């Protein structure tokens, strides 16, 4: 029998003197699928005493997991499938959900609502994480975390398998295919530094959603939507779907759609305030990354660290070293990013002799035209004189991070 919300809250209240322990255990149990789904224990943790920092942290973790799960459920419901070649740069359409044999129709307006709901869910997770104080710790096995995308508890997706699939170019596992194996044991001990880190990721994801919702991309959706969602709304054009007498095939049409999609990326601004909000969220991401590192560098323990300091050796992630020079390089890179977002430094363009003011791109937005940005024409209204981050800045960032800038940026946030 599944415990009631009242019972969960009562068990936490009874053990309040133990502070984070029982609440952390409840959060870990929910994350690992050993108890009720994310939402019910998150509500119970919200009802815990104000001083229970394990409850605050656990609620934030569960709300983040629930946000990702709800977004994945929406993608499954509408049959999200393998991104076509050349369209993998669309980050919110790369979630490898199982194939849905009976997808529902999807309109442009419904897709915007899905993104808005994801943004709202991330905001709730971030708000809970922002209340965490002290140094609570939640220990759990990342590979035991499962997400229910299909509505069938028997088909929950393990986080480890999800990560493994995303490493395979975001290709979902088709019916009958073997699941790629994730790590067998991925135990972590999330602490205060990780609470700040996850807040930052909430902001980073939210910035991308704010950018999308700031623009009208309905034409692009109409062109390429069917390649992602089988029943997406599209113009009634009699395209070839199989080989015809001229040798043309449906696959040739897929390539043509990608070309048309790129041409259609000239998105009008429909909600300009969201562009300013995206900039603020990016600045918050930078501030939280700094705060996270300040906390990490002050830690004296050493237990299954998600992001270890140079002095911590028991790391849950071991694909890249964390040395004093790497940390210093990352913090210096954050300074450049912040300067660009504030307009203190300009951003260079391969074709222009001046830099452009990135802050004004957000605060004084114009239609986003991908081709014109690539050619430099779209940067013209924002050109200015001043210190500029050009290609040498990229080389410097990469050198400071041991040649692995992108990997560290994804990990460190």
What is each stretch, according to the model?
Residues 22-42, 64-387:
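Short coil/linker segments at helix-helix boundaries
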Residues 1-5:
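Positively charged n-region of N-terminal signal peptides that target proteins for export
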Residues 51-56:
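Short helix-capping/linker turns of helical repeat alpha-solenoids
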Residues 399-413:
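Short, low-complexity, Pro/Ser/Thr/Gly-rich segments in the mature regions of secreted, periplasmic
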Residues 45-50:
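Solenoid-like repeat scaffolds
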Residues 57-59, 91-92:
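Alpha-solenoid helical repeat scaffolds
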Residues 6-16:
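Bacterial N-terminal signal peptides
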């Amino acid at each position: 029998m599944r415990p009631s919300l009242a019972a969960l809250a009562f068990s936490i209240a009874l053990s309040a003197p133990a502070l984070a322990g029982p609440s952390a255990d409840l959060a870990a149990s929910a994350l690992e699928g050993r108890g009720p789904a994310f939402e019910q224990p998150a509500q119970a943790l919200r009802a815990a005493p104000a001083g229970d920092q394990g409850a605050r942290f656990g609620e934030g973790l569960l709300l983040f997991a629930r946000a990702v799960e709800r977004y994945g459920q929406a993608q499954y419901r509408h049959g999200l499938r393998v991104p076509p070649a050349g369209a993998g740069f669309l980050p919110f359409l790369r979630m490898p959900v199982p194939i849905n044999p009976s997808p529902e129709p999807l309109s442009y307006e419904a897709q915007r609502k899905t993104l808005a709901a994801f943004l709202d869910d991330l905001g709730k997770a971030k708000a809970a994480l922002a209340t965490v104080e002290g140094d609570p710790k939640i220990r759990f096995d990342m590979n035991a975390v499962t997400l229910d995308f299909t509505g069938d508890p028997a088909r929950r997706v393990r986080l480890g398998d999800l990560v493994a699939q995303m490493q395979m170019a975001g290709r979902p596992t088709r019916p009958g295919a073997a699941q790629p194996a994730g790590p067998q044991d991925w135990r972590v001990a999330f602490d205060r530094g990780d609470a700040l880190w996850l807040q930052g990721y909430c902001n980073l994801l939210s910035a991308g959603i704010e950018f999308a919702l700031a623009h009208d991309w309905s034409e692009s959706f109409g062109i390429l939507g069917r390649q992602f969602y089988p029943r997406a709304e599209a113009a009634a054009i009699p395209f070839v779907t199989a080989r015809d007498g001229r040798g043309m095939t449906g696959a040739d049409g897929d390539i043509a759609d990608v070309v048309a999609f790129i041409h259609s990326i000239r998105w009008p601004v429909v909600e300009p305030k969201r562009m300013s909000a995206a900039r603020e969220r990016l600045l918050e991401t930078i501030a939280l990354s700094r705060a996270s590192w300040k906390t990490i560098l002050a830690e004296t323990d050493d237990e299954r660290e998600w992001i270890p300091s140079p002095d911590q050796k028991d790391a849950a992630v071991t694909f890249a070293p964390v040395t004093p020079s790497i940390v210093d390089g990352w913090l210096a890179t954050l300074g450049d990013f912040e300067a660009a977002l504030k307009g203190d430094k300009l951003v260079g363009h391969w074709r222009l002799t001046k830099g452009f003011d990135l802050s004004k791109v957000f605060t004084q937005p114009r239609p986003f035209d991908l081709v014109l940005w690539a050619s430099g024409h779209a940067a013209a209204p924002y050109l200015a004189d001043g210190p500029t981050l050009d290609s040498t800045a990229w080389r410097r960032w990469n050198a400071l991070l041991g040649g692995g800038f992108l990997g560290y940026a994804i990990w460190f946030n």
